[in-house]
A protein has these predicted regions:
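Anionic-ligand binding patches
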Residues: 1-128
Length: 128
């Protein structure tokens, strides 16, 4: 018997999904578009209860957090991209790393922006 948890996170700006950047130019473009603006971070989560290889129960949910970034200079963006940090992250930034200096406000769950809304996951499992 086991519980399977799957999750993925996206960044949304003006209705457009920003996934992981394809290259450094894409990362710079994403960060420039986020600079000085508020965007949303969504994490979709699926929970599956499996017994003897059969799914017994399942539920899905999502969490949304509003994130506002300060205005960034081209040099700040270039230096951050050169660090390699944004290349494997939706929206080309990781709030838990170097990009923290670019965040001016968060409305919602910080851990959702990191990639897993852990409090919500815990409470969903408790009700599962």
């Amino acid at each position: 018997n086991c519980l399977v948890i799957g999750a993925d996170t996206i960044v949304v700006l003006d209705g457009k999904i920003l996934g992981k950047p394809s290259d450094e130019a894409d990362a710079r473009a994403m960060l420039a578009s986020l600079s000085g603006r508020t965007h949303q971070v969504y994490t979709g989560v699926a929970l599956f209860s499996v017994k003897e290889g059969i799914i017994e129960k399942k539920t899905t949910f999502h969490e949304c957090t509003d994130v506002t970034m300060v205005s960034m200079t081209e040099k700040e963006i270039a230096d951050y991209v050169a660090s390699g940090d944004p290349m494997d992250k939706a929206g080309a930034y990781g709030i838990q790393g170097l990009a923290a200096i670019f965040i001016s406000e968060i409305k919602g769950d910080y851990y959702n922006v990191v990639g897993l809304p852990i409090s919500r996951v815990y409470h969903e499992i408790e009700q599962f």
